[in-house]
Curated annotation (Swiss-Prot):
Organism whose genome encodes this protein: Clostridium novyi (strain NT)
CDD domains assigned to the protein according to its UniProt record, in alphabetical order: GTP_cyclohydro2
Region span, DHBP synthase: 1-203
Gene for this chain: ribBA
Protein name (Swiss-Prot/TrEMBL): Riboflavin biosynthesis protein RibBA
Reaction catalyzed: D-ribulose 5-phosphate = (2S)-2-hydroxy-3-oxobutyl phosphate + formate + H(+); GTP + 4 H2O = 2,5-diamino-6-hydroxy-4-(5-phosphoribosylamino)-pyrimidine + formate + 2 phosphate + 3 H(+)
Taxonomic lineage from the root: Bacteria, Bacillati, Bacillota, Clostridia, Eubacteriales
Bridged cysteine pairs (disulfide): none
Function: Catalyzes the conversion of D-ribulose 5-phosphate to formate and 3,4-dihydroxy-2-butanone 4-phosphate. Catalyzes the conversion of GTP to 2,5-diamino-6-ribosylamino-4(3H)-pyrimidinone 5'-phosphate (DARP), formate and pyrophosphate.
């Protein structure tokens, strides 16, 4: 979808706020569809008629779980076998409607459902409007049109409920991105992607919560340890802080991903444990800095999957191909949470200890200024040379290998 020009999320929010519709596109590996979408409280008979005439799909009303409970709207089926887990409830009509199917009466049902004080007795079941339950956490938990509708309405400062309708071509086939680009031009609509909405939310909202702190004497020096909880995933991360890091001056920072095998068990397959030790020594030496210990084991795939990847590496694969063979990208880590922790710590400018350019761009993309990349290169050994070579050759890590003349592909990880 990169070759197409999409609107910004800010533009979409403004149109939603003003009662307009926008087209929202999901991932091409998901439904690969576009929906007309607007805020439920802004719905009019004209809008419903437009959806029915020019979108041609099923008109639905995404809502929060809390609102659905207030209206006593239970799930349509107990065992949801839909591959995308679309959470339909029983359909409804307002008790003030006749047949409930006209554009006027469908608009009435929607606006009545989002009114403050609306009660279950105000609606008859079944009906012609199909409420959908949005997941808590919105598009950050499920990248669907249901969640996008609630998120966009919320971001626009409106009631967290939307109205959506899938867009079909005139011949009845589903409209894909090339069709949708022509569609928005004809109807003068904005078009955005759920992927961009996810990125927007990650950059503009905070999902971490400080849970506690204490002093932590270590063999590397004295630190303050601060615990954080990721409210979306429930994962717990920690920051080890040395000295005053809030005075606006650039701070020496290491964002370190958890590696049980390297950090705790002393594995020679990687350089993680040595990098952790070197970073803490360097921060302590400078007297000012922080190390973030992020619970993103195995570049985000988790400990068990990392062990499975090790087995594939034992059989000749490198670390990248092993991840791909297990169905994962080469790197699943989310640097946004680390950036949010840095903001909570009062850090604005960073001297980042890393060999990974993607980590630099990943953190700077969240509003943290990276003033310097500080190398943290560890001397390799026979057990991890192939792994480190792979990081350099295939993942773009900046490694010098001063002791080694050439890349010997015959060297495998232990």
């Amino acid at each position: 979808m990169e070759q197409f020009k999409f609107n910004t999320i800010e533009e979409a929010i403004e149109d939603i706020k003003n009662g307009k519709m926008v087209v929202v596109v999901d991932d091409e590996d998901r439904e690969n569809e576009g929906d007309l979408l607007m805020a439920a409280e802004k719905v009019t008979p004209e809008a419903i008629n437009f959806m029915a005439k020019y979108a041609r799909g099923l008109i639905c009303m995404p809502m929060t779980e809390e609102k659905l409970k207030e209206l006593d709207l239970y799930q349509m089926v107990i065992n949801n076998t839909d591959t995308k887990e679309t959470a339909f409830t029983v359909s409804i009509d307002s008790v003030e409607t006749t047949t409930g199917i006209s554009a006027f009466e469908r608009a009435l049902t929607i606006t009545k459902a989002v009114e403050k004080g609306a009660k279950a007795k105000d609606f008859q079941r079944p009906g012609h409007i199909f409420p959908l339950r949005a997941r808590k956490g919105g598009v950050l938990k499920r990248a669907g049109h249901t969640e996008a509708a609630v998120d966009l309405a919320t971001l626009a400062g409106l009631t967290p409920a939307g109205t959506i309708c899938e867009i079909m071509n005139e011949d009845g086939t589903m409209a894909r991105v090339p069709d949708l680009m022509k569609y928005v031009k004809v109807h003068n609509l904005k078009i955005v992607t759920i992927a961009d909405l996810i990125e927007y939310r990650r950059k503009t909202e905070s999902f971490i919560e400080r849970q506690g702190s204490a002093s932590l004497p270590t063999k590397y020096g004295e630190f303050e340890i601060i615990g954080y909880e990721d409210k979306l995933t429930g994962k717990e991360h920690v920051a080890l802080v040395k000295g005053d890091i809030k005075n606006g001056e650039p701070v020496l920072i290491r964002v370190h991903s958890e590696c049980l095998t390297g950090d705790v068990l002393g594995s020679l397959r990687c350089d993680c444990g040595d990098q952790l030790a070197q970073a803490l020594r360097q921060i302590n030496k400078e007297g000012r800095g922080a190390l973030l210990y992020m619970r993103q084991e195995g570049r985000g795939i988790g400990l068990i999957n990392k062990i499975k990847a090790y087995k594939l590496q034992d059989n000749g694969m490198d670390t990248v191909d092993a991840n791909l063979a297990l169905g994962f990208p080469e790197d699943l880590r989310d640097y946004g949470i680390g950036a949010q922790i840095l903001k909570d710590l009062g850090v604005e400018k960073v001297r980042l200890m890393t060999n990974n350019p993607k980590k630099v761009s990943g953190i700077s993309g969240y509003g943290i200024e990276i003033v310097e990349r500080v190398p943290i290169e560890i001397e390799c050994n026979k057990k991890n040379e192939f792994y480190l070579r792979t990081k350099k050759e295939r993942m773009g890590h900046i490694l010098n290998f001063k002791n080694i003349k050439k890349y010997d592909k015959s060297i495998k990880e232990a």
